[in-house]
Amino acid sequence: MEFWFSELHSPHVKFDIRVEKQLFSGESDYQRIDVFQSPEFGKFLTLNGSVIFSEQDCFIYNEMVVHVPMSVHPDVKNVLIIGGGDGGVSKELLQYDNIENIDIVEQDNMFVDVCREYFPETASGLEDERVHIYNSDALRFLRSKQDMYDLIINDATDPFGASEGLFTREFYGNCYKALKEDGILVYQHGSPFYDEDEDACRSMHRKVFHTFPISRVYQAHIPTSPSGYWLFGFASKKYHPLKDFKPAEWKRRNIHTEYYTTNLHTGAFMLPKYVEELLEQEEER
């Protein structure tokens, strides 16, 4: 008998992954966590029935939220990751010698423990002495921070449930205050392909656009994401992701990647027409 994991991407679209076995299932104070073994995507983790990452394609997401801002900002030293309890984002950041401190705010201890047990290679990004994990509510954590971080990466999963407060105007305003005068915020922007997800994308862009002087959106192909098409947001007080992009300087760092390139960086900001129109409509509101 074959076993399949199924996730509804819309009322009319279902995403299925054949499963060899279930490795873990548990309920934390915040969410249900499951880990599966599959022949196509390797091990993959789900929260409340939605795929969060897999061994096969997690490198795409991690590289795109890290190397895009790191190739623009000339001297990132202090980083805040909101979420990030799997260690994938911090692992990418740790390739940069100039980074002195990485704060990870992850309120779900069970999520961190599960990732350490079942995804040790990814979770190795939690073990460096530059990394500090805070078991705290991110919104509350941010309220006390001002002019502190060069880069904030919002790695929260979605604008619902336990992460709902991380997609509000108050949250983005607190990010603005917590960033230094030349700081950058990067966040996952979701996918606008299905009607059910479009409203969240619109709302997110509207809030960030009216909070930061520079706000752009870029894209990547992530197979396990809804529709396979995923957007990211880049917001900054000073740096533009293309005008201040320094490809030659980034290449001299000899950073290892499997997805990100300096050519891809430029192309990632060239959005399809329907996405451009959606974003422009929110900028005019």
From Swiss-Prot:
S-methyl-5'-thioadenosine binds at Q31, E106, D137, A138. Its EC number is 2.5.1.16. It catalyses: S-adenosyl 3-(methylsulfanyl)propylamine + putrescine = S-methyl-5'-thioadenosine + spermidine + H(+). GO terms for molecular function: spermidine synthase activity. Transmembrane segments: none annotated. Residues 2-237 form the PABS domain. One of its GO terms (biological process) is spermidine biosynthetic process. It is an enzyme of class 2 (transferase). The keyword Cytoplasm applies. Disulfide bonds: none annotated. InterPro entries: PABS, SAM-dependent_MTases_sf, Spermi_synthase, Spermidine_synt_N, Spermidine_synt_N_sf. It is found in: Cytoplasm. GO terms for cellular component: cytosol. SUPFAM superfamilies: S-adenosyl-L-methionine-dependent methyltransferases. Belongs to the spermidine/spermine synthase family. Catalyzes the irreversible transfer of a propylamine group from the amino donor S-adenosylmethioninamine (decarboxy-AdoMet) to putrescine (1,4-diaminobutane) to yield spermidine. HAMAP family: Spermidine_synth (MF_00198). Homodimer or homotetramer. This is Polyamine aminopropyltransferase. It comes from Lachnospira eligens (strain ATCC 27750 / DSM 3376 / VPI C15-48 / C15-B4) (Eubacterium eligens). The gene is speE.
